[in-house]
Amino acid sequence: MSRIGKKPVQVPAGITATVDGQKVTAKGPKGELFFVANDEISLKLEDNAVVVTPLNQSKNARSKWGMSRTMIEGIFKGVKDGFERKLEINGVGYRAAMQGKNLQLALGFSHDVVYEPPVGITIAVPKPTEIVVSGINKQQVGQVAAEIREYRGPEPYKGKGVKYADERIVRKEGKKK
């Protein structure tokens, strides 16, 4: 039995949640999101909470049970507070700047890298060495942050590159003479 799945998801104050068959829709101050559950999962709205239950005890249904509950919790948090991911840039001459809606990165290439964020994602550059990716969809925020990091990931010798703010780089020692 899923310890995560059996807990009902409370609908926070200020959010309107509707359940229509396999689809949960949440409307809040930041926007609107929906989640469509697997056919083997049952969704009910009871006492201002969404109850997630598997329709049968198959391995597939049980594996989707906890994931569905977590996804519903994620859309509630997204439409209420939103998600953000911070990135840091280390290295001489490495910097970021906004160019309209696009992010312009100087990462040691012969050209500047220009990243156009998808719809629903906001990118901010508080300092030339900091990038903040924010939005209401947790998966999309993480995906955009990963794509930006991929342009020049941190290298293990000097730690140069783009890294997550909470990421710890395992450093290596250089060659010995």
Swiss-Prot record:
MF terms per GO, please?
Answer: rRNA binding; structural constituent of ribosome
Cellular component, GO, one term: cytosolic large ribosomal subunit
Q: Which GO terms describe its biological process?
A: cytoplasmic translation
- This protein's UniProt keywords: Ribonucleoprotein, Ribosomal protein, RNA-binding, rRNA-binding
Q: Does the keyword Ribosomal protein apply?
A: yes
Q: Which domain of life is it from?
A: Bacteria
Main function: This protein binds to the 23S rRNA, and is important in its secondary structure. It is located near the subunit interface in the base of the L7/L12 stalk, and near the tRNA binding site of the peptidyltransferase center.
Family per record: Belongs to the universal ribosomal protein uL6 family.
What the entry lists under HAMAP family is as follows: Ribosomal_uL6_B
PANTHER family, per database record: 60S/50S RIBOSOMAL PROTEIN L6/L9 (PTHR11655), LARGE RIBOSOMAL SUBUNIT PROTEIN UL6M (PTHR11655:SF14)
Self-association or partners: how does it assemble?
Part of the 50S ribosomal subunit.
Q: Name it.
A: Large ribosomal subunit protein uL6
Q: Which organism is it from?
A: Rhizobium etli (strain CIAT 652)
